[in-house]
Amino acid sequence: MTVRNTCCALLLGCALIPLIIACDKWENETVESTYQGIITPDPTYNFKRAGNSSVDILECKLLKEAVDLTYRHLHEANFTNEELYKLARGYYENGEFGLKPQEEIATSSQHEANRAQLLAEVEDIFTKSCELSGYGKPNASMIRNTPAEEGKGGYLGVNIGDANLCFADAKGVVVAELFQGIADGSIYLDKVLNIHLDDALFQNEALRMAHQNAEVLPGRNYTELEHHWDLAYGYYQYWLPYTQGNGLAILRDSKINLYNAFARGRGALTRYRYDSVELQIKNIRKELSKVVAVRAMRAFVGENTEANLAEEIRNALFFISQGCGALYALPFTRKEDGSSFFSYAEVQTMLEELTSGRGLWDAERLQGTTDTEGALQHIASTIGQRFGIALEEVKRNR
C-alpha cells in the first residue's frame, strides 16, 4: 500500500469512529447524541478607558455560582438531614458575596407581577425535593433510595450510585430542572433583555449626559450606561451555550450575530450614537429570543428526547423535564417592539397540559401529534408558531 493510500485509509477509519460511537447503545440506557458542531474560538469583548478595562461582569459570575450550588443540591435531592437542607437554602436565600438568587427572580418592572408566583414555585420545588430526600423522616436514606415509578417519586437511573442520577416527582418531573429553567429565564434572561437593555435606560437624558461627561461610578472605570450594557453581556454568557445549535441551520449565525450586536452596541455607546445602540438592542432581542425558543422546542422534540422516548420513558424524563424548565424563559423574551412573546399564564397552561393525568409517564400522549393536547410535538409547535419557527427547523438531519 502506498503512503497516499495508507493516509486515505487512516482518514476513512477516523471518519467512521464518530459514527460508531454515536450508534452504540444498550437496552435501558439513556441515549444522548454525541454530535458536536464545529467549535470556533470566542471573540474577545474588550473595552478600555485611559488604558484600563472599563468592563466589569464579576457580579454575573458570583450570582451564577450561588444559583449553581442551589441547583446542585436540588439535583441530588440529598436533604436527608437538617444541616444539608439549611446549606441548600442558604445558597438560595443568602447567596455568595451578597448576591442572593431568591432576591433576583423576576425583578424587572415588566415581570414583577409574576414574582410572587415564581417564588412560590421555587418553594414547591424545595418541598418536593425534601419529600424525595425523605427529609424529616426516620428512614430518610431508604426513601431517597427508592426508584421513581408512575405515581411515585424517586430516583431515575439503574441504581442509586449512578453518576448521572436525578430525582423525579410522582408526575415524572425532575424538579431540579424546573429550578434551573426558572433561574435561566427569570434571573439571567430577565436581566439581559428587561433590566440592563431596557429602552428606558438608554433614552434617559440624565444618564446620557452623565455618560457623555465621562462621569464614572464611584471607584470604578465605567459610566452607568456602560455598566448596564456590560452586565447584559455578562448575563448573556449563561445563554451562550444554547447558541451553538449542534448543526442546526436556524442557529448557524446566532452566536456571531449576538456577539456582533453586543460589541457594536457597546462601541456605539462609546461614540454616543444612541440610535445605533437602540438598533443593536432590537437585534439582541430578536436573536436571543429565537435562541430561547429553539432551546425549548429541542428539549421536547430533539434527537435526545425522541430516541429515549422510543426506547424507554424513564430515560426520556430528564430531557422532557429540561423542556418543562425551558418554558419558564418564554415570558422573558421580547419582540423588537419590547412586548413579550408569551405570557406567564400561557406557560402555566402548557405545563398543566404536560403534567395532567399520568403526567410525563404517559408516553402514548407525549408521542402524539401536533393536534394532541399535551403531546411534545403540540407543545413545541405552539412555541414555534409564536416565533415563526417550524418543527423541522429544530431537528438535526440524521
List where the protein language model places each region:
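Mature extracytoplasmic or organellar-lumen-exposed domains after removal of signal/transit peptides
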Residues: 28-398
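C-terminal motif of bacterial Sec signal peptides marking the signal peptidase cleavage site
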Residues: 18-22
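Bacterial N-terminal signal peptides that target proteins for export
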Residues: 1-10
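Hydrophobic alpha-helical transmembrane segments of integral membrane proteins
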Residues: 14-15
